[in-house]
Regions:
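Surface-exposed loop and membrane-interface regions of Gram-negative outer-membrane beta-barrel proteins
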Residues: 79-111, 123-142
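Internal, well-ordered domain-core segments that constitute the primary functional module
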Residues: 123-235
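Exposed, low-structure sequence patches enriched in small/polar residues
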Residues: 215-227, 231-494
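Extracytoplasmic loops and strand-loop junctions of Gram-negative outer membrane beta-barrel proteins
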Residues: 52-56, 89, 132-135, 185-190, ...
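Sequence/structural signature of outer-membrane beta-barrel proteins
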Residues: 42-44, 89-95, 121-137, 158, ...
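Bacterial Sec-dependent N-terminal signal peptides
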Residues: 1-27, 489-494
């Protein structure tokens, strides 16, 4: 029976892959290069928040920094419906623990709408606007990419026999952390953490949209799941975590750990898990569009069953291409205050809260065994509005401020054909965690103004400048500016 289900799933996947809604032939057959020179200065000890956040982890947090980024990327179609690609991207940055590092190194092969990728690659899987959103709660652009094997359907693809009304996309990946040396340098001597962590994530989205007659209303619904597992603890008494093939299946399916797992993982599920339900309703006309969305975040089964009420990211976006100077506007509200209640009482009421389900104090992005939390190189993988462990000045690990209420506003537009801008403003409130609340609420604002300039006689060149500021007690006070130059071009067209 299981084999039959696998065969049927394969047939359905093959059928869908041959009905691409966003054609892969749009990918340019070429070998391209990209170089970027960036530098910033600030009055505080840290670079202003929005100069650092959602940059795939390449901009150093410390004030007075600079970086050089150089990459080569190849895409080429071959045969009937096949394509392959590869990329190498190297960053040199100061000040930083390691001044030169590989940001991206991957190879991939695709058929129709399917893509198999191996290595570290900057991806964007979120439904929210890439330039203006504060960030996806499960997989944002805030941290460096984790090396992984990723099988995906990256673009929405038509489902057969639905008359163009139903499209799907998703991915499935297994990866591994390579930040052990960094954590050893950052963490104080009292910190216990798991090194060489293994990762799993998957997502599935379906979209109800009229692709034939342009009916303006559409609905997108999705689910995302991320998990940390395996690895070896720096505490010899804890040692190596379960990481057999059977354990991998347990992590994928969200099941309890075996007899070799910790007591907590035997009671709940193996590893540390994070996820979300994503909802987006869109109304799109030829010259304008409106989108309303909600991302319901969860750490365990209680959150999956909405015991954490309305926690998550709420958003509104307007697309305004008919306006001369304003193209898009985004407003978001992030709230993580409920967390299924203030106390984790799973051990006190076993009849009500069965194994595999948490019972309060979900402690978003944190975990008892995986003390680094939902981060890579100490940058949060999810929303940057829950401040990353990199902001911990005492060498401690984990997220110290995950009970937040934040408002975020953003806009972008074109002043003329050569000059564009982006504006971000965020007001943040933080109360610490349920176990370790702040004595006084922390508050702060972060703002950014980006200006980008291109010239028709300087093909492939982009010049950028930014001014940013942080205020209040949340992140500290800092005012800064940055300058950047980017050059892209084609080495060879195929």
């Amino acid at each position: 029976m299981k084999a039959l289900r696998i065969i049927l799933a394969g047939i359905i996947l093959y059928g869908i892959s041959n009905n691409s809604y966003s054609q892969t032939t749009d990918i340019q057959d070429a070998t391209i290069y990209k170089t970027e020179l960036f530098g910033s200065a600030a009055t505080g000890s840290n670079t202003p928040f929005w100069m650092v956040s959602n940059r795939y982890g390449i901009v150093p947090q410390e004030a007075g920094n600079g970086l050089l980024n150089a990459g080569v990327f190849h895409n080429q179609h071959f045969g009937k419906g096949f394509r392959w690609g590869a990329g190498l991207d190297i960053v040199a940055a100061v000040p930083r623990y390691r001044n030169v590092f590989i940001q991206q190194a991957y190879a991939e092969i695709g058929y129709k709408s399917l893509l198999l990728s191996v290595g570290s690659k900057e991806r964007y899987n979120s439904l929210w606007d890439r330039n203006l959103s504060s960030g996806d709660m499960v997989q944002s652009t805030n941290a460096r990419p984790i090396p992984e094997v990723n099988l995906s359907m990256p673009e929405f693809t038509l489902v057969p026999l639905t008359k163009g009304w139903l499209q799907v996309r998703g991915d499935f990946a297994m990866g591994r952390s390579f930040d052990t040396d960094y954590l050893k340098d950052f963490a104080n001597s009292k910190q216990v953490y798991i090194k060489n962590v293994l990762w799993h994530h998957k997502s599935f989205f379906f979209q109800i949209k009229d692709t034939e007659n342009d009916f303006p209303l559409s609905l997108t619904v999705g689910v995302q799941h991320y998990a940390q597992w395996g690895g070896t603890s720096t505490d010899p008494k804890i040692g190596k975590q379960p990481q057999s093939f059977k354990d991998m299946i347990r992590v994928i399916c969200g099941q309890k750990g075996g007899s070799d797992a910790t007591l907590s993982d035997q009671i709940n599920v193996l590893g540390s898990h994070y996820g979300s339900y994503d909802f987006k309703l869109s109304y799109t006309e030829k010259d304008w569009g409106a989108h309303i969305y909600y991302q319901h975040y969860f750490n365990d089964k209680s959150g999956m069953e909405f015991a954490n009420k309305t926690d998550g990211l709420w958003g509104l976006q307007f697309d305004l291409p008919f306006l001369p100077w304003l193209n898009k506007v985004v407003a978001e509200y992030l709230v993580t205050m409920n967390q299924s209640g203030p106390m984790h009482f799973i051990l006190f009421d076993r009849d009500k809260w069965q194994g595999g389900r948490g019972g309060g104090n979900d402690d978003y992005y944190n975990n008892g065994e995986y003390t680094t939390g939902f981060s890579y190189f100490n940058r949060g993988i999810g929303s940057p509005l829950i401040p990353s462990p990199e902001y911990n000045t005492d060498g401690s690990l984990g997220f110290k401020n995950n009970r937040v209420k934040s408002w975020h506003f953003a806009a972008e537009g074109d002043i003329n054909t050569q000059l564009s801008y982006r504006v971000l403003f965020t007001a943040m409130n933080g109360w610490g965690t349920s176990y370790f609340p702040f004595l006084n609420k922390k508050f702060g604002t972060s703002s950014l103004v980006d200006i980008n300039y291109t010239h028709p006689k300087l093909q492939g060149w982009k010049f950028s400048g930014s001014v940013a500021a942080d205020t209040g007690t949340m992140l500290g006070k800092s005012v800064g500016f940055s300058l950047g130059v980017t050059k892209t071009g084609i080495l060879k067209a195929w």
